[in-house]
Amino acid sequence: MNKCLDFIYPENISCIICDKSIKKTNTYSICKSCFKEMNFIQDGCMKCGKPIIRHSIEKEFIEECSYCFNKDFYFDKSISCIEYNDVTKKIVLGLKYNQKTFMAKYIAQIMKEKLYLENIKFDYILFVPLHKKRLNKRGFNQAQKIAFNLSKIVNIPLLDCISRKKYTRMLYK
């Protein structure tokens, strides 16, 4: 009976990034050393979401990075939660290519906190669709999994209303 209870209510779990044993109270089920490596973005470019480094002598608020400054985009704003580094790469690649679909829940939790922090209001959640070929090969759409979890957490409707027509090359692997 104890083994059954340990399975349902485990005392310790593993870090979703490095598999190190942790307490289930750890933030996002990530160990302290991996969590320290996650660089949460405070000030980001309004267009690409990359961090903007502010200097103490700057008096005016900079909204765009040097790359995006004076470029036209087909959207108003982009927000990034965390810098892409070795630790966050393991989360993304684990979800996309190693069938670790449970990671979508943790990504959605991080996104929820950023949305609340930035006081962002919205009516619907959409996700970027995969081409049918890629969806058949992978078996799931990671963006849809994240969007589904985010929709549940923030109680905002998820819409599946756009489709991908063009097959594009993979960015990784």
Regions found by a protein language model. Name each.
Residues 1-173:
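Glycine-rich phosphate/pyrophosphate-handling loop used in enzymes and phosphotransfer proteins
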